[in-house]
Amino acid sequence: MEKLMEEKKTTLWQEIKICRVDETNYPHDLKKIKDRPEVLYYRGNIDILNEHKSIAVVGSRKISAVGAKLAYNAGSIIGKNGFNLVNGLALGCDAEALKGALAAGGKCAVVLPCGINEIYPKSNQWIAEEVLKQGGCLISEYPEGTRPEKYRFVQRDRLQSGMSQGVLVVEAMEKSGTMHTAEYAKKQNRRLACY
């Protein structure tokens, strides 16, 4: 039984797929932004981004207890209502929102600041595995083997907003990475809300 479980886990991580901007499964909303990537690398079901509306939920890594509850509840509401939850798998708000969406049976799209073969942060790998098990996807604009660098987090933020119809900020400092996502939402004419 243990061997079967390990094989099943390994299978989730085996195949990295590529989606070009001219392909039908490239996220339609992402096609509309000026600085879209020409190629996306992904695992899982990227089609969810064209089948259902998506909402990005982002916020502080160092989240308060109230913020954690709000992020979880926001994720749960998004999941229960048939929307995709999009974020970057970061500690704090991102992780709590993903947990809420997954617990509600929702689908999630995680945008990574590195190659798809590396989950960042490693402590959230179990969440990434749950995203795949529940029919979601992991996405990156970077090829396998690309390490997470500071500037790649900002680049990831534009994709989180770009593939969503709206961005919900739960908690954030004025000069935080979350504010990059909020700025991209404004530039990309996405709905922006604070919770």
Range-by-range predicted roles:
Residues 12-195:
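Glycine-biased, small-residue-rich flexible motifs in mid-sequence functional cores and linkers
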